[in-house]
Structure formats: C-alpha cells, structure tokens
Amino acid sequence: MCVIIIKQKNNVMSEEIAKTSSKINPHGLGIIWLDTFEVEYHKSKDYRKLLTKRPFIAHFRYATKGKVNKANTHPFICGNNKDEYLMHNGTIKGMGTDECCDSKELACHLGSINRIDWKKELEQYDSRFVSINVRTRSFQIYNRNLYTYRDGIWYSKANVLQDNLIAVYGTLKKGFGNYYS
C-alpha cells in the first residue's frame, strides 16, 4: 500500500524509518527534490538517497495493481502536462490493470480535467495524494487528515514509524519481485 514521505525542513530523516519504508514497500522509489524540483526513479533499496538535509517528496511503492517496473513507479505525469505530477498511497477501485497501476491511470485522468477540479476529484477517495507542479515549484497534499506528522516530516502511512515491523500488506503476486531485481 505504499508510503509517501514529505520532508521540507533541514533535518535528516531516520535511517531506520527509510529502511523500513524500503523493506515493506520494495517495488520502487520515486523522489522529487524540493530544492530543484528534479524527478528521480530508483529501486526501493536505494533508500539511503533520502538520508540528506535536502527537502524532498518520496514515494515507496508496494504493488497492488500493475507490473513492478519503472513505468509504474511514482511520481506520474498528469496526462500531457509535463509540469504536473501525482503521488498516491492507496488503491482506487475500478482502476488499474495487470500492466498499469491504478495511480498511473488516475494521473492520466487528472490531466484531462481542469486543475481547479482536482481537489474534488481526489478527495472522493479514501487515499492519500500529493500533486506537484515542477514549473511553479509547488505541491498540494490531499486528504492531509490521513497523514501522520512527526519531527517535521509527513508520512502517508504510520506503519513505517513502528519499531520491529515484520509484516507487509497481503502477499506478493507470483512473479513480483523488487523493481529492477
């Protein structure tokens, strides 16, 4: 079920939290650096990239729909607008296929509607979202009440903050492994 981590301050996140995020969400890591608004895609095991004072929004993926590959690693471009990106934590019923994850399908849909209507569209789901505009260097958190804020960092799921966490959501689909493994 993924996790989105938003770190805006000059602090460094805990290595244990980054490692736990990677361990329970092993299917890809996407990062938008908030000082440059550059977008990067990595393997989840590259979590040490986040042990920095640089501000970022990161997404660790746990595949529930769609293949485990770079194409299904967040953030996703919203339709044809190369400036707008979406990160999502949750599952959207009725979206996604064996090939394409639900979040990517939703991002494509958002690109086809007026930006002013995104809030209404996203708040209808019991999920967590962040939209990022790399041109205006801004971002918006949706359903913020579902996030946990600790030590200057927002977490879309509090399970990564638990000590000695050993369980993951459900079981992996046959043939699913770590992104790029």
Predicted regions and their residues:
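Extreme N-terminus nucleophile/cap motif
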Residues: 1-49, 53-56, 146-154, 159-162
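Conserved beta-strand-loop-short alpha-helix elements that form
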Residues: 2, 83-96
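Short beta-strand scaffold segments in enzyme catalytic cores
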Residues: 2-6, 28-35, 74-77, 127-140
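Regulatory input/activation interfaces that engage signals or partners
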Residues: 59, 64
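Acidic loop->beta-strand submotif enriched in PP2C/PPM serine/threonine phosphatases
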Residues: 65-85, 121
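Cytochrome P450 core scaffold surrounding the K-helix E-X-X-R motif
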Residues: 66-68, 95-97, 175-180
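Short histidine
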Residues: 93-149
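Glycine-aromatic micro-motifs
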Residues: 161-181
